[in-house]
């Protein structure tokens, strides 16, 4: 796997922590970030199906963060500095960071809900299509 992706499991705990998941009979609370600044916050869902994907691009400057609310997604990655291709499966409760010059495409293994955030406004010139996964 490329060094341009970082995956972190948010711990499930009753203890006070700035980043965690709390699962109770009444529902779930996820403390995703605390202290990080961001200017863009988005949400997307992705259904399983032939030809259904999100992404298919890379960024020269933007560092993207994602939180998996539910489901499982196969992420196809290409490190554009080394040419190395890899895949990883991300799932509910994981926080993911994708760094610049890493082409990425998401395909659902099961229907998924995802929060996306980053510390810049959306810049269409930094959303560069990529197809060679």
Regions from the PLM with identified roles:
Residues 1-40:
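A short, N-terminal "cap"/entry segment at the start of jelly-roll beta-barrel domains
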Residues 61-78:
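Glycine- and acidic-residue-biased ligand/ion/polar-headgroup-sensing regions
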Residues 63-68, 88, 96, 105-106:
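His/acidic/aromatic-lined binding-pocket segments of jelly-roll/cupin-type domains
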């Amino acid at each position: 796997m490329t060094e341009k992706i970082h995956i972190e499991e948010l711990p499930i705990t009753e203890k006070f922590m700035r980043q965690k998941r709390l699962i109770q009979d009444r529902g779930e609370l996820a403390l995703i970030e605390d202290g990080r600044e961001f200017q863009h916050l988005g949400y997307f869902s992705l259904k399983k199906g032939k030809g259904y994907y999100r992404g298919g691009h890379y960024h020269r400057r933007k560092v993207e963060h994602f939180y998996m609310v539910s489901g499982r997604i196969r992420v196809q990655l290409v490190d554009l500095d080394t040419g190395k291709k890899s895949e990883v499966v991300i799932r509910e409760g994981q926080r993911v960071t994708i760094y610049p010059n890493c082409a990425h495409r998401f395909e659902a293994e099961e229907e998924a809900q995802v929060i996306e955030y980053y510390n810049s406004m959306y810049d269409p010139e930094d959303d560069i299509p990529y197809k060679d996964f």
